[in-house]
A protein has these predicted regions:
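Phosphate/diphosphate-binding loops
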Residues: 192, 199-206
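A catalytic-pocket lid/entrance helix-loop region that shapes and gates access to the active site
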Residues: 38-39, 89-103
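NAD(P)-dependent dehydrogenases' Rossmann-like dinucleotide-binding region
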Residues: 66-84, 98, 102-113, 156-166, ...
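Oxidoreductase and adenylate-handling cofactor-binding alpha/beta cores
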Residues: 52-75, 89-92, 136-165
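Rossmann-like dinucleotide-binding domain that binds NAD(P)(H)
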Residues: 104-196
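Beta-strand-loop-alpha-helix segment that lines the small-molecule cofactor/substrate pocket
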Residues: 3-51, 65
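Short, solvent-exposed loop/turn and secondary-structure capping segments
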Residues: 3-8, 28-29, 55-56, 82-88, ...
């Protein structure tokens, strides 16, 4: 996990340039921020799209008023391209760990579970214990230009819908609900800011 490696560097007072996803939770993000401040260390999260010419051109167009006031924005990805929303629980098979994989190191701070190719490589993104789903995986790339161009900060409202509804998950009563859904729609409402009107941004995946 990036947060674990980043924390180890920060505690040694080393500057950190960390790739996304920087953390797995909000609490981890806050802990990294506090540690960086404590040691006076410069940090930055990498996002290659933010350095691209396309993002800068978008900002210039919006800031110059080329397309007028923006009150609605949409962001979409075809993710997940890995198995998601499976209501089958964890794999029961326990195949051997590949010889070139340190499974304990790979798990990091996540709870212990046997190795299975349903998690690694790549498919870990779909599991709550390891990934952040489609929004966490691609949102920082796709939504970043909108945040930059529209000078967005914190939303005043958020509404989410998914392709699956599992009341038991929120009560931690059903062990089968450990994966992110196949698709989601998330609507964010942002207030007026810096001469720009209120804007609604909708995230679509699946």
């Amino acid at each position: 996990p990036h947060a674990v490696v980043a924390m180890a560097a920060l505690e040694r007072k080393k500057p950190v340039y960390v790739q996304k996803p920087r953390t797995h939770s909000v609490s981890e993000a806050r802990l990294l921020t506090e540690t960086a401040r404590k040691h006076g260390v410069v940090t930055q999260m990498g996002n290659q799209g933010h350095s691209g010419e396309g993002a800068r051109i978008l900002c210039e167009m919006v800031w110059d008023g080329a397309i007028g006031p923006i009150r609605e924005a949409h962001a979409w990805t075809n993710r997940p391209v890995w198995p998601s929303g499976l209501e089958v629980g964890r794999p029961e098979e326990t195949p051997e760990v590949p010889p070139d994989l340190d499974w304990d190191l790979w798990l990091g701070p996540a709870a212990e579970r046997p190795y299975h190719p349903a998690y690694h490589p790549a498919k870990w993104r779909a599991w709550w214990d390891f990934g952040t789903g489609s929004l966490g995986d691609m949102g920082c790339h796709i939504v970043d230009p909108l945040f930059w161009a529209l000078k967005l900060r914190y939303p005043v409202s958020v509404e989410a819908n998914t392709s699956q509804y599992w009341p038991a998950f929120f009560q931690k009563a059903d062990p089968k609900n450990e994966m992110f859904p196949r698709s989601t729609i998330v609507r964010f409402g942002f207030p007026a800011r810096e001469g720009m009107p209120e804007v609604n941004m909708t995230w679509w995946d699946g």
